Each structure stands twice: as structure tokens, then as C-alpha cells.
Amino acid sequence: MEDRRIGVYVCNCGTNIAKVVDCDAVSDFAKKLPGVAVARSYKYMCSNPGQEMIIQDIRELSLDRVVVAACSPRMHEPTFRKALQTAGINPYFLEMANIREQCSWVHDDARAATDKALALAHAAVRRVVHHEPLEKRFVDMCPATLVLGGGIAGLTAALELSDAGQPVFLVEKDDHLGGNLARVDLTAPYLDSARDMLADRIRRVLESPKIEVLLRSTLQSLSGFVGNFRAEIRVGADGARTVDVGSVLVATGFREFDARRIEHYGYGRLPNVVTSFELERMLREGRILTRGGRVPKYFAMIHCVGSRNPEYHGYCSRVCCMTALKYGHEIKSALPGAYVYDLYIDMHAFGKGCEDFYRRTAEMKTMFLMYAKGTTPEIVPSGPDDDCEMLIKVHEVLSGEEIEVPADLVVLMVGMEAREDAADVAHLVSISQDKDGWFIESHPKLDPVATTTEGVFIAGTCQAPKGIPGSVAQAEAAAARILGKISRGKIEVDAVFAEVDETRCSGCRMCNELCPYAAIEYDAATKRSRVISAVCKACGCCVAACPSGAIQGRHFTDRQIFSQIEGVLEWASSQG
Amino acid sequence: MAIRANPRLVEELEHYGAEDVAKCYHCGNCSAVCPFSREPFLFPRKSMRYLQMGLEEKLLGNLEPWLCYYCGECSEECPREAEPGETMMSMRRWLTSRYDFTGISKLFYRSWKAELAAILLVALLTGAGFLLFGFRWGGGHLGVYAGEGAFLTTGAVHVFDWILGCVLAAFLGINCARMWWFSIGKDRTLRIPPLAYLRQAFLLPVHFFTQKRYAECGKKRPWAIHLALMLSYTTMLVLIMFFLHAMHSERTVWAAHGFGYLATIGLLGTSIYALRGRIRKEETHYKHSHETDWIFLILLVFVAGTGILQNVLYRVFHLDVAANVVYVVHMMGVVPMLGLEVPFSKWAHLAYRPLAMYFSELQAEAIRERERAVAAAGAPLPA
């Protein structure tokens, strides 16, 4: 152990760590540990001067192992690995002790938090001694992409990829392209025709020699790993295709909330209560009529149907407010004598041109009636003297009055929800869903179109409710990410993965069943299991499960983990 | 019981000048910035809301538009340019038309052509009547302006003035009673003890003569102009109703004429200032002009101008014939101005505004009393 030269670097993270943990005490303590050549405390280790300090120490003091006591390794492990590499030693000679998320951010007691930081630093020093040099590897990248979903996001991504000269397989469940946008008439806030937007994209997709469109098709299975996927696709009733692709883009869209679930709105029971998509259809056909064939005079849009209500969906569906305002414009231009009300909770008019659109809709004398979150307007039959089909009763918040308004057509602004087959898709392509069923991105802000599965991207409303500009931007971002991988030609595979010692493997196949990434193959001939290193995420399930102890995780060897645990325990026992 | 919203009311109020109310999104900046807005009358936002939603009954019993003097600060602060000040002005016009039981006011506000035609008709009838009187029944001569053998005898004109005054007072009185009914009488939840009416009655003359709430506005000039106009008008009214003999005498009676000249300067100065302001649109409260605003100001300038002209023609130039002709023309302005504008149009506010100050204080007292009663009933019993 004494032959190691370890550097320990304690980050103050401004005051994030230092305000609770005594960082100087941690570095003073580390200095005395066996094998530690240098220990320092610094304001921001991740800053350029912080990294320079490490690099200089490695070179001048001939350090061969580095411990950084700072934030979570998810945050800055790549940063410090790079520093090690720059200094000329193997990047895996690094170990991080998380004294921010695990100490200063979660504890109030400065003394106890400092004690815990000392224990974690000790454990990291004990562990890093056993780190082994690991090398990254590269595999080939297949340039074809599988795009799931022929809506505006899928079409856009397919065009971006094919325009760059790369082949695309566009899989659409329906018998036509266009997705949900094909059901829309005009679009907010500029009142452009959705049909015009789509028609051009669909024509270009169909004409592109690089895009193969598979209608009435669904993905059956996906195997392999980034750069080397194999997809089984069912085409039509009984056709099948197998394609090799390097990347997968999931753009499967949303489905609308089922308005029947909110019973007292009477959708399905009251003839003139319709959903926003039904009104879209009327607008596209140019025939806006009540069920009785009368031209309606009073239109009421009820916002947040299924959205922003903990009983249904707590989230905002983002597009319904502007869509409802759009109806105001379309209705008043089709029927100049009509009256339009918007029964809303809050007006969400974010986005380019939307606040202005809201203002213009107000100027057209649309009546905005605010109802309280947690309440719902009530639809009741009209009286014999009324010139309307129904009355809507609502406690109007801005006036504080109980009011009723006449209505001929009630339009329920149904929100977006995850598709019924979202869970199947997620399972097929190994991505996760959040509590509402939306696919989870790699990072909500910094990596919005990648997923935790390398090579699988998401775009459009399958990720979360959003409008056309957001969907298109995501599709283009995903295409750019895919093209980036294609242009590099090779895929870098992390050096951390599990390995099977074939001499000790009994062929029980327990690991094959357990692996969440389908990264373990079973060779029937040799009766041994083998890890596909490019697919392995180093989660460690197989390592823990193997009854023969035949599997070891690189960078997570028993020796490394046990010495880390011993580090904590030794420190604790030294404290009595 | 739910109140029925009427989407047509916004359209109706457009005729009264409320063109921008639909833009309001209820941020409440207007009520926050208004120097007059205070509990329990937080305006103009809530009035804007009643109008947007077409809560006609609420609006009809709402005194808040009369509590507003239109200093314009709300319109200047409004982030949506919904012109709350002008909307309140429009609601005053609409309320005037609703207080009026004859429907004439509604006709005038909705059609300036009808108002103009009515003014011309009354003017012509007045002219014809005075000419007939002068030539046929009065026994005077066109060459005599005042004293023995005057074309229009003071006594006859005085009687005519009082008859006209009584008719106007009757119309206005009925409308004021309707205003009381809509705002206080109809509301069964308000209990106002008769003594309160007496106790607060002093508010009527106070607000009429000082317009002190207007003085609370950050800008003092509009208040000063308005006060000068009102005092000049009142002075002239008093002179004509009680001192017509002195005004119309052969000699200059400075005790009466001095006030007359002051009032004329006040009337002409302020109305020309207002006209110029409405043309230039520099001050917020002059930015929007309804047709009735123009008619009112033009009539005022006309009446004040012909009034001083007859005086000058007689007393300075001793031109009796010209003075008599201008006198008849003057009456052709006075009668429609008082007869039509006071009960049915813009000038009705001389009664409605002080009344609203008075009624609103009664309302406020009753509301406070009601809240106290509710609080007392809801309070836990002593152990």
C-alpha cells in the first residue's frame, strides 16, 4: 500500500460543502493516511485552476491515484477523469467521495457531517489503491436509423437524417403518415394550416430514396446495442421485416385524454358536448353544427379537461390554452355572430407569439371566465325560454360570482396523455417512463432527447406534452445527435462492464434472466454465458447474482468494494 | 342563485365608448394605482369584470363608475391598454341612460344624429316661441333690449326659466330616485337606518361644491379645471334663476354683473380648454371622446359666447336690435342645453356624482355593519 502515491482533493463547492463540512479538517485528516502524498482543500475543484492543481500535482509529485472529495460522480467524474488523462495517467485511477449530496446537502449537524465526510474520504482512499488501469474500446456504427412514429416529430427527424444522406426506416402504426397533427385544422398562434405543413413533409418523405416508410407496422423486438441494433418489425397483418440500425428514435406521440372519465361533463351522454379533436374535425370540414343540425351561437371551451387535476393528470398539457384561443379565432371567422367563452384555470400563454395571440383573442371579445383549480364547471339543461342548448354554471373567480352562461356547443379541451402502448414501447427499446407514462430523457435540461439507453433517442410528445415547435426542435436535435454518432463512424464503449470467468461459469443462466439490458448471451455450444461488453451498463446485477462467483464487474471488483467498506468501518471503530 | 352572463353587454357598451374593455386580463394594476379606490369599493377592476361578463344587474346597481373622476392614472398603468378610465366613463354614460326612465338618454347616447336632431328641433321651437312672443304677445319692440317696452320682458323670461327648471328637476328627480332604487333600494341585504340618510346628507353639498375626491388625484389641474367649470355654471344658474332682473336691467349692476363676467370667463375658459384638450388628446382623460362630449362642449361654448355677446352688444355698443337677436339665439342654445343635456345626457352627472358619493357612503356603512354582524355571529361564545 505504501508504494502508492495518492492525491486527495477536497472541494468546498463555494459554500455548498464548506458551510457544513469542515473541508480543511478533511484534507488534514487525509494527509495522514497511508499512501497519501498530498491532500488539499480548494474552493472549486471542478474549475480550471482546480483541475490544473490536480494535473500539476500528478506530474510534479508523481501521483498514481487520485481521490476527489466533492459532489456526486454523476456530476463531475468525467471532468476529473479527463484531468487524470491529461496529466498522463489512466483515467480510472480516480475515485470520488460524495461529500456534497451525501453530507453537506442532507445534514444540518456540521460535526456529524464532517465525521461522515472523513469516513467517506477514508473509504475512497482505501478503495482507490486497488483501482486498475482500464482502456476504452470502439465498435462500428451502423448509419441506418429506425424512427418509430410518423407524426410531425418522426417525419422531421426522418427528413433531417435522409437529407444528410443516411438511410431511415420510418415505422408507422397507422395506415397513413401525419400522426395527431393530421387531425388538426389551423395551428396557434399564427393560424397556419396544419395540413399544408404536413403535406409538404409527407411528400418529401415519400419521395426520398433514403427513407423506407413502413405503414401499419409495429416494432416487435429490438436487440443489440448502440451502433449495432437489430429490429424485428411486423408489417401489416402478417408481413415481417428485420432491419439493422445504429440508432433508434422513438417519436410515438400522445393520445388525448378520454373525456368520458370526467362524468359530470356528460361527454358521450350530452349530444352537444364535444372534444377539441371533434371540433377540429368540424372546422376542417367547414360544417359547425349542433347534433340537432342547428348553427350554434354560443361556444364554451372548457380548459384543463384531464389536465392539472390530481384526480386525472397533475401536469399541464401545454397546448390546450392556445388551441382554445385558436378556436375563438376560427369560430368567429366562420360565424361572425357567435359568442365564445373560455372557462379556464390559468391562461398558459408562454411561447413565441402566444401572449400576443392571447391579447388579440381578448380583443375579439372572447369572454374569459376563470374557474378555481379543484372545481369544475357544471353543465345543466337550458330552460324553455332560453335560446341555447345548455347552461354552464361556474363559480367565476375574478368576479367572485356564481354565474351561468348560455351554451350551444361545449368543447372539452382534452389534455395529452401517454399512449396506451407506451409501456410496451419503453420495454422494447429499454427506456423508462415517468409516473405519468412519458418517456424519460437522459437529463431534463442538458440532455433532453437522449435516453439512458445509448443509441435510443426520444422526440415529440412521447417525452412530454408539447407543441409543434417543441416537437420539431426535438426531432431535429435527435437527428443531429444521431448524425454526430454516424459521422464519428465508431462508438466508444465504456471500459466499465461485467466479465464472466468462463472457467468458473456453470452455465446456470441465472444472469441471462436477470440482466435488465439483455447484455448477456448464452453460448449453447460451450454452455457458458458471455457479457456483450458494449451493451453492459455495469449495473452489477449479474455480479451479485452469480452463484459461482464467476462474474466480476470491472472497476467494481470485490476487492475494491470491500476495501471501501472496510475504510468506513475502520474509521468508525477508530472513533470508538 | 346564479347570475346569467350576457355576452352582448360588451357590444352594447361599445355604443357608450367602451371599446377596449375586452383587453383587460385582471392584473389589478388599475385598482392598485387608483387614488380613490378603497374598501369596500375597489375599482375599476371589478366593474370591468362585471362588464366583460355582462352581469347587467350587478352593473346597474354599481355606484363605482360615479366614484371615479377619471384622472386617467389607471389607463396609463394598464399593461393591456384596456383603458379602464374610459371604460368607467362609458359605464357612467350607460348608467345615465339606464337611470333615465324615458329612454331618451339611451337614444341620444346610441345615436349622435338623434341627439343633434333633437337639439335642433328644440332650438327651432324655442326660437319660434320667443319670436312669436316678442312680436305678437309681449307688446315690446325689437329695438328695445331692456326696461320699458323690451322685446323679451324679464318677467316673462323668468317665468319661463322657472317652468323649465321645474320640469327638468322633475325628470332628474325621478332618475335620481331610480338610481337609489337600483343601487340601494333593491338590495335586500343592505339595511340602512333612516337616520343615516340624514346624518350623511351633508356629503351632497360637500361633494357638489368641492369635488374633494377629485382633488385626491396626483394631478391637480383636471380637478381645478373641473371645479372652475362647475362653480361658473352654478354661479350663472343662480344669477339667472334669482337675479334675472338685475342681469337684464338697463344699468350695469356690478353686484350681479361682476359675478356674471367671472362666470362667463370661467365657462368659456374651461370649455375651450377642454375642447382644445380633446382635439390634442395629450391628457389621458381627453384621449377618447364620445360624440356626446363634443356636443356638450360645443353647446356650452355657444351658450356662453352668445350670452356674453348680447351683453356686450347692448352695454358697450348700445345695439338693441342686435342684442335682442342674439338673445333669442342664446335662448335657442340655452333651452336645448339645459332641457336635453341635464336630464338625458352628460350634465346629469351634476346630480348623479354627489348622489353616488352619498349613497356609497351609506352602502359602505351598511356593508361594514353587516360584516360586524357576521363576525359577531361567527365568534365563539364566551366560556
Predicted regions and their residues:
Chain B
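Hydrophobic cores of alpha-helical transmembrane segments in multi-pass integral membrane proteins
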Residues: 91, 117-132, 158-177, 225-245, ...
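Membrane-interfacial loop-to-transmembrane-helix junctions in polytopic alpha-helical membrane proteins
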Residues: 14-20, 61, 153-156, 214-224, ...
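Secondary-structure capping and boundary motifs in well-ordered enzyme cores
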Residues: 23-26, 60-63, 67-70, 261-264, ...
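Iron-sulfur-cluster electron-transfer modules
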Residues: 21, 38, 48-245, 249
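Cytosolic juxtamembrane regulatory segments of multi-pass membrane proteins
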Residues: 194-209, 302, 361-383
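Flexible metal-binding regulatory segments at protein termini and peripheral loops
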Residues: 1-2, 92, 96, 383
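Hydrophobic alpha-helical transmembrane segments of multi-pass small-molecule transporters/permeases
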Residues: 29, 33, 73, 77, ...
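Ferredoxin-type iron-sulfur electron-transfer modules and their immediate structural context
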Residues: 1-65, 350, 358, 364-365, ...
